[in-house]
Amino acid sequence: ICNGQWTSVGSAGLYYTIKADSMCVDIHYTDGFIQPSCQGLQVIGPCNRYQNGPRDFVACQTSGGSGHPICIQSTNGNIELCANCYCPQ
């Protein structure tokens, strides 16, 4: 479990929180389930929310690993956490 502040994010009735420190990102769902981020990535920037039509993104700038942002994509109630996916700029 990461250190840092929890930030609440809501999407289409699905609410979860995100917490990031220099090494990881935690996703905490309302049902209490916590999913850690991919290992080997360092969060070097704040997490931001992006909305693109029905898609809802939360992206954290990272270094290490692929170097791509960690992106949480929520579409139709589904969330994917990936280290190498498209995040809107």
UniProtKB/Swiss-Prot annotation:
MF terms (GO), sorted A to Z: toxin activity
Assembly description: Homodimer.
Paired cysteines (S-S): none
Entry keywords, A to Z: Amidation, Disulfide bond, Toxin
Keyword Cytoplasm: no
Its job: Blocks calcium currents via interaction with a yet unknown target protein. Has no effect on L-type, T-type, N-type or P/Q-type voltage-gated calcium channels (VGCC). Has no effect on voltage-gated potassium or chloride channels. Blocks non-L-type VGCC calcium currents in mouse duodenal myocytes (IC(50)=0.2 uM). Blocks calcium influx induced by hypoxia/reoxygenation in rat hepatocytes.
Maturation and modification: Contains disulfide bonds which may also be involved in dimerization.
Positions carrying Glutamine amide: Q89
Protein name per Swiss-Prot or TrEMBL: Mapacalcine
